[in-house]
Amino acid sequence: MLKGFKEFLARGNIVDLAVAVVIGTAFTALVTKFTDSIITPLINRIGVNAQSDVGILRIGIGGGQTIDLNVLLSAAINFFLIAFAVYFLVVLPYNTLRKKGEVEQPGDTQVVLLTEIRDLLAQTNGDSPGRHGGRGTPSPTDGPLASTESQ
């Protein structure tokens, strides 16, 4: 059981996750402070009556009590700023790199497989492997039909 846990830790995914959590927490704190110190005061002044503290985003319900929609709006702005940053700084580059890796990998294995097939065919026909391309890559004249036509 401990061996499996050690392998899980050694894979590196847990370290990446820990780094992401720490950076995400720090970034969330930064955006929260930005929203609290700059955005919230601006929102608080929207539609406020000069004689009272009631306005468009603060609804007076009597007895000096208000429903404060400014807090909700500030939290929504905070959420969208964090979501925007995470998507464009983490998710989008990650998906781009993952797709790029997936596209390159099948092409490389296909070339290796075709090179092995060509070399096996060349050995069967008595030719030296890679003699047509010179660099170990198949040329247009390489292949099973090219070797049988010359016989």
Curated annotation (Swiss-Prot):
It is found in: Cell membrane. It comes from the Bacteria. One of its GO terms (cellular component) is plasma membrane. Residues 122-151 are annotated as: Disordered. One of its GO terms (molecular function) is mechanosensitive monoatomic ion channel activity. Channel that opens in response to stretch forces in the membrane lipid bilayer. May participate in the regulation of osmotic pressure changes within the cell. It comes from Mycobacterium bovis (strain BCG / Pasteur 1173P2). It is a multi-pass membrane protein. Belongs to the MscL family. InterPro entries: Mechanosensitive_channel_CS (IPR019823), MS_channel (IPR001185), MSC/AndL (IPR037673), MscL_channel (IPR036019). Its main location: membrane. Keywords: Cell membrane, Ion channel, Ion transport, Membrane, Transmembrane, Transmembrane helix, Transport. The chain crosses the membrane at residues 12-32, 71-91. Homopentamer. This is Large-conductance mechanosensitive channel. The keyword Ion transport applies. PANTHER family: LARGE-CONDUCTANCE MECHANOSENSITIVE CHANNEL (PTHR30266:SF2), MECHANOSENSITIVE CHANNEL MSCL (PTHR30266).
